[in-house]
Amino acid sequence: MSLIINTFYSNKEIFLQELISNASDALDKIRYESLTDPSKLDGGKELKIDIIPNPRECILTLVNTGIGMTKADLINNLGAIAKSGTEAFMEAFQSCAEISMIGQFGVGFYSAYLVAEKVAITKHNDEEQYSWVSSAGSSFTLHVDHGEPIDRDTKVILHLKEDQTEYLEERWVKEVVKKHPQFIGCLIAVYLEKEPEKEISDDEEEKGEKEEEDKDDKEKPKTEDVGSDEEDDTDKNNKKKTKKIKEKYTDREELNQTKPIWTRNPDDITQEECGEFYKSLTSAWEDHLAVKQFPVEEQEENEQLCVHHVWIMDSFDDLMPEYVGFVREDKENNKKLDEVFSKISWLGIHEDSINWRHLSELLWSHTFQSGDEMTSLSEYVSCMKEAQKSICDIIGECKEQVANSAFVEQEWKKGFEVIYMSEPIDEYCVQQLKEFDGKSLLSVTKEGLELPEDEEEKKIMEESNVKFENLCRLMKEILDKKVERVTISSRLVSSPCRIVTSTYS
């Protein structure tokens, strides 16, 4: 058991978060069942989680008013590692798609053994009270509990190890609740034993005793005793003696008073609620400066899966990747579909390491020769000249910019097609698509692009290299570290020069 616990968890404080999550699950279950059977709440209608530290006995107790557990639940859920009661519950209520269930006493329950030995006492609505006890070994005991009777509650008692008493401190409990389950859907309260010093006088100390005497004196005849002036002066000069005592009491404090306002309609949220939320979240005393409300996650609508004209389901997240988007079928808008969906496919190529090759067949782009029409990569490859070894592309801000670029002069002269990439996503995703149909993709703005040359062109290049060798050396000395090297290029036609980047930049 110790090996399993320490394998799952490296941070000990996670145990409180896990136990609160389990308690929240139990509360969600009883709340759900009470919708159809109100008698489920006969044992108490308040749904809450209480945290009770006891430093004197080194015990930390968590009590929730959730669904509770039967004897069979204790054996099946607590007695079997990682068995999830919530999983079984969700199987019984599959139609409940909006209730979030994490896992009632699954592996998270065993995180308690990071800091403690464990006792769980529970009572279900329909059974007597049982106690389940285990010390992180391979065995546990289960017996009828004749201690303090509880209603529908589940009480989890942690007998902390000697070196783990820090988890009983008020500061730590509040810090963990604020960090993790602060906005959980049920009330979380901590019960703290306070012992402040109080200064009292001798008269106050004896007040309790005198109250009884005064009660008896009321029944006796009253007599008036008039003292002398000397006695009055003496009383005035006498000062009351005081001393300090410690007064014990239990303080209950709600730890999650601020509710998750982001789950509500912005029109229903007041400025006062926004202010309370801001101060609770930031621990600030000042008022917030301004409020900006905007949705960061929209509900998907109008998506349905139908087979043979029969509706199957509305939610199918696992069936379609996020990058796949659809428009209603309209043959007249096929061109628009190509323009829109082609760019979404680029995103899919970057995100989907399995299907990127299939998605690349859906890509459409403008090219040098296509004009206003778009060309697929498959059509591009089929029209490539025999001497062309790579798929040429150029990235720019817009189609007009790349069409007039000096980088495509030689390609145009030789009649090679160049793919125009003028969308922001193109440069980001082309890094993943390094080849298509056996042809590598190479940008004309980078070095390494080889264009076919005849014998005459090769001879001219050799002569030019010799003729302008000193000029290239001088240009490199002038530019120094601003460039890696200066060379003669056959890729220019009318432009005097151009700057290219390295292949892997």
From Swiss-Prot:
Belongs to the heat shock protein 90 family. It holds the Pfam family HSP90. It comes from Homo sapiens (Human). ATP binds at N22, K83, F109. It is found in: Cytoplasm. One of its GO terms (biological process) is cellular response to heat. InterPro entries: HATPase_C_sf, HSP90_C, Hsp90_fam, Hsp90_N, Ribosomal_Su5_D2-typ_SF. Residues 200-216 have a biased composition (Acidic residues). Putative molecular chaperone that may promote the maturation, structural maintenance and proper regulation of specific target proteins. Residues 197-248 are annotated as: Disordered. One of its GO terms (molecular function) is ATP binding. This is Putative heat shock protein HSP 90-beta 4. SMART domains: HATPase_c (SM00387).
